[in-house]
Amino acid sequence: MHAASREAFERLIKTLDQGLKESDNAVGNGATTGTELFDVVDVLDQERSLRVAMVDAAATPEQRVELVKTLLSGKVTASTEEIVSAAVSQNWSNSQDFRTGLERLGRRALLRSAEAQGQLERVEEELFSLARILERESELELLLSDRAAAVDDRRDLLAKVLYGKVSSVTEALALQAVGRARKAPVDLLDDLCQEAASLNGYEVARVTSAGPLSEEQKASLSEKLHKIYGRKIAVHTEVDSSLLGGAVVRVGDEVIDGSTAGKLERMRRSLA
């Protein structure tokens, strides 16, 4: 996002969070608002002229709010309409930033719903696990990323895969990740995992080890990474026996390769 859009988005985050905090049903309102914001984004993806009209600098904020009322009144809850109205009242750098802002607000609303249920950590873990499954199941990822197929068909496919296996919030977040052209579903799921961790005050560490790590080992690693990075780290693990031993740790764009395979490769290069 550009500077003006970032400022607008930060103000909207405060509006959304405050509204859910004051709600007597943060779980239900968060889930409904998030889902409805995704529906609005789907419409904006199909109607570029509408997206442009909602951030038209030639129109007054009041005129843009009136457009929102005309389109959404009676079709979404009052809280969703209020968020979209607040969004069009802001100054955005471009219409794409506006659309992205609404999508991110939808994600945050759903994560706040999970937080209110005490399920935020579970959602974080499920998102990480789902991303790893898609990495392993390349055929499934290709089907979900196939732009020649209708978005609804791809989402139906993923819904069948997820049915009864994850929380409702995880399912809603995962389904909205399908059909977003700018990123592959795996990358969006990793972004969502990090967003969930951030709400808990953590950053995600992706740890690939030659064998399963015990809870004690994960806790010890989390503490060591905390000392290195100066912030709390949520450790998510996966097993890759080809590493032979040790582990590879990824935090953001940084990689710490302490695997046996990595050490052997570095030794081979030094001798070449």
From Swiss-Prot:
Q: How does it sit in the membrane?
A: Peripheral membrane protein
Taxonomically, which superkingdom? Bacteria
> Which named protein is this?
ATP synthase subunit delta
Q: Which GO terms describe its cellular component?
A: plasma membrane; proton-transporting ATP synthase complex
Q: Which PROSITE patterns match?
A: ATPASE_DELTA
Q: What is the lineage of its organism?
A: Bacteria, Bacillati, Actinomycetota, Actinomycetes, Mycobacteriales
Q: Which UniProt keywords apply?
A: ATP synthesis, Cell membrane, CF(1), Hydrogen ion transport, Ion transport, Membrane, Transport
Query: Cross-referenced NCBIfam families, in alphabetical order?
Result: ATP_synt_delta, PRK13430.1
Would I find DNA repair among this entry's keywords?
no
The record's listing under InterPro entries reads: ATP_synth_OSCP/delta_N_sf (IPR026015), ATPase_OSCP/d_CS (IPR020781), ATPase_OSCP/dsu (IPR000711)
Gene name on record? atpH
Function in brief: F(1)F(0) ATP synthase produces ATP from ADP in the presence of a proton or sodium gradient. F-type ATPases consist of two structural domains, F(1) containing the extramembraneous catalytic core and F(0) containing the membrane proton channel, linked together by a central stalk and a peripheral stalk. During catalysis, ATP synthesis in the catalytic domain of F(1) is coupled via a rotary mechanism of the central stalk subunits to proton translocation.
- Quaternary structure note: F-type ATPases have 2 components, F(1) - the catalytic core - and F(0) - the membrane proton channel. F(1) has five subunits: alpha(3), beta(3), gamma(1), delta(1), epsilon(1). F(0) has three main subunits: a(1), b(2) and c(10-14). The alpha and beta chains form an alternating ring which encloses part of the gamma chain. F(1) is attached to F(0) by a central stalk formed by the gamma and epsilon chains, while a peripheral stalk is formed by the delta and b chains.
Q: Which is one GO molecular function term here?
A: proton-transporting ATP synthase activity, rotational mechanism
Q: Which organism is it from?
A: Corynebacterium urealyticum (strain ATCC 43042 / DSM 7109)
A Pfam family cross-referenced in the UniProt record is OSCP
Concerning PANTHER family, the annotation shows: ATP SYNTHASE DELTA CHAIN (PTHR11910)
Subcellular localization(s) per the UniProt record: Cell membrane
